[in-house]
Regions:
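A general sequence property marking short-to-moderate contiguous segments
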Residues: 2, 20-21
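Bacterial N-terminal signal peptides
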Residues: 8-18
């Protein structure tokens, strides 16, 4: 099974062909080019990329053990290779060579007719060559489709099935979210949750910090902006104990850190609010700027300081 990576790592382009392979026809082999690069951070994985000219490309990390004939020795040796990847939807045969930890060559995908007959029986027939390739690359499984149907997701498009395979949306992940109150989320929300790792553990962690009964969209937003329990505790240690989620997100977006807070306090703003800190960050006001302004006007406020900065950048917008 392919390992899940961040969305930026997965490149999966569907350019659906106008001519589909009907369920009664034998599916011809599909060919293209492959590239493999050994992962310097994880010796058990490689970066596998497959492409079919300009039509489709796919890239992801995959365990070495999932590629028959691949050896970790190829990371440091030159060799001609014959490799194989067996998935439910078909078998990839790869030929090529390795040099300096990088491999490249040609592949040939032989579709599994039994798999596509079972897929057609579930309503997914007349698939294009690109969709056949997609099913094999994502390691789509009939058992996973049946699990989704049993969980109430029985009206999924073929592209939804691809997403379920890529982002590991299955009975277990659905049950995990249901255990914390998110019952029968729309499928696109399941995808978002999987991409940004919103699971029962994260929900319980946020609840333990006082953020209870948050809508699923807010939990995703927290993950997008990396609002972790550690970050929440960091903000509270800065003396801001009762901030709502929107204010936390603002602080994170504009990089309001304990160091920045201490810099502002040392420059003379000993009592400063989160909103004021955000405004200072927005207008790129640092400790040196504050000290210079306070040397000219010891009683200057944050608001006046921001107005002064705006006026310096846009003289025509002077304070009326």
């Amino acid at each position: 099974m392919l390992t899940k990576t961040a969305l930026a790592v997965i490149l999966f382009v569907f350019c659906l062909a106008p001519v589909a392979v009907t369920s009664g026809q034998s599916r011809a082999p599909i060919t293209g080019e492959w590239r493999i690069e050994f992962n310097k951070k994880n010796a058990d994985e490689v970066q596998l990329s497959m492409s079919r000219g300009q039509k489709q490309s796919w890239s992801n990390n995959i365990k070495i053990s999932e590629i028959q004939g691949l050896s970790a020795n190829y990371a440091n040796a030159a060799a001609e290779v014959t490799l194989r990847i067996v998935h439910d939807a078909g078998t990839f045969d790869l030929v090529g060579s390795f040099r300096d930890g990088k491999g490249a060559g040609k592949f040939r995908l032989t579709p599994n007719e039994g798999f596509f007959s079972a897929l057609a029986a579930r309503g997914y027939s007349n698939l294009s060559e690109d969709q056949i390739f997609g099913a094999a690359m994502s390691d789509l499984k009939i058992s996973a489709i049946d699990e989704l149907k049993a969980a109430g997701y029985d009206q999924l498009t073929f592209n939804n099935l691809m997403e379920s395979a890529i982002f590991k949306i299955n009975a277990a992940s659905i049950a995990d979210l249901r255990s914390v109150g998110f019952d029968h989320l729309p499928f696109n929300k399941l995808v978002e949750g999987s991409i940004f790792k919103v699971d029962s553990n994260y929900v319980r962690e946020t609840e333990s910090l006082g953020f209870t009964k948050l809508p699923f969209e807010k939990l995703v937003e927290m993950r997008v902006h990396k609002i972790t329990p550690e970050y929440i505790n960091q903000v509270r240690q800065m003396g801001f104990n009762d901030l709502n989620l929107d204010r936390l997100v603002e602080l994170k977006i504009f990089n309001v850190t304990p160091e920045f807070l201490n810099e502002m306090r040392a420059a003379g703003f000993t009592s400063i609010t989160p909103k004021q800190l955000v405004n200072l960050r927005i207008f790129k006001i640092d400790g040196d700027y504050v000290r210079k302004a306070k040397s000219e006007d010891p009683n200057i406020t944050v608001e006046k300081l921001v107005e002064q900065k705006i006026f310096e950048k846009h003289p025509g917008r002077g304070i009326q």
